């Protein structure tokens, strides 16, 4: 129960319940992450405490956005090792979560975690956002699209906004100093049917790093020509 108190405190601050059962799932997730990371590149963060703070708590902080709390269906685009999608599913089993990633090895890892943690409200999809963003079973079918991927906001918006329903949201987990990136992405956000809703500054107790939650509201349907085919989104962003 070494990290229970710190995780419980951070959850209490944002008004969500943290239990010993949830803690146990996070600790098993940590063990699997460390185990699989020895044979494939899942994360550069391998220390117990760093995983808890920079992966688990960082992901849980997304609940500071009320649209996450209210959501019934969320897709995590480019989920990697499962952040923030898996922690969202662990914290709230009323939310249906879909994890999308382009690398089969990572999807295999995610499936193992889901099985080990006996999570019933989460599934994985192997593929690219550019392909599934035009698939009628996924396009505009989610209350919220989330991503902690490293792409800039213009690129991330084209990857993610097609998944959000009209009236839904994109919530991107970004680092500090986000204003210039948002300004550059304004055209892309508008073209794709979105508008900037707000930026939530996320602070961490006794830590020198901070993050921002960039919240984009989907006001209009995304034009049919977006997302563009694989490769074009990153090479030629809408700016």
UniProtKB/Swiss-Prot annotation:
Pfam families: GidB
Subcellular location: Cytoplasm
Root EC class: transferase
EC number(s) from the headed UniProt entry: 2.1.1.-
Cross-referenced CDD domains: AdoMet_MTases (cd02440)
Keywords assigned: Cytoplasm, Methyltransferase, rRNA processing, S-adenosyl-L-methionine, Transferase
Free-text function comment from the UniProt entry: Specifically methylates the N7 position of a guanine in 16S rRNA.
Protein name, UniProt field: Ribosomal RNA small subunit methyltransferase G
């Amino acid at each position: 129960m070494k990290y229970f108190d710190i995780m419980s405190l951070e959850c209490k601050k944002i008004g969500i319940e943290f239990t010993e059962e949830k803690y146990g799932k996070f600790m098993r997730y940590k063990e699997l992450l460390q185990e699989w990371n020895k044979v494939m590149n899942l994360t550069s963060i391998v220390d117990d405490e760093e995983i808890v703070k920079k992966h688990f708590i960082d992901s849980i902080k997304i609940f500071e956005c009320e649209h996450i709390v209210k959501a019934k269906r969320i897709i995590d685009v480019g989920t990697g090792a499962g952040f923030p999608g898996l922690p969202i599913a662990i914290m709230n089993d009323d939310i249906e979560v879909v994890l999308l990633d382009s690398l089969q090895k990572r999807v295999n890892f995610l499936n193992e975690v889901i099985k080990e943690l006996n999570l019933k409200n989460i599934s994985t999809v192997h593929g690219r956002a550019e392909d599934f963003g035009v698939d009628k079973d996924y396009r505009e079918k989610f209350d919220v699209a989330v991503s902690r991927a490293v792409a800039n906001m213009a690129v991330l918006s084209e990857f993610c906004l097609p998944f959000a329903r009209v009236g839904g949201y994109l919530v991107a987990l970004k680092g500090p100093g986000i204003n210039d990136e948002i300004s550059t992405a304004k055209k892309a956000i508008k073209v794709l049917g979105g508008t900037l809703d707000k930026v939530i500054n996320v602070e961490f107790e006794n830590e020198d790093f901070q993050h921002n939650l960039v919240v984009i509201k989907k006001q209009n349907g995304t034009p049919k020509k977006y997302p563009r085919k694989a490769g074009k989104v990153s090479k030629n962003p809408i700016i």
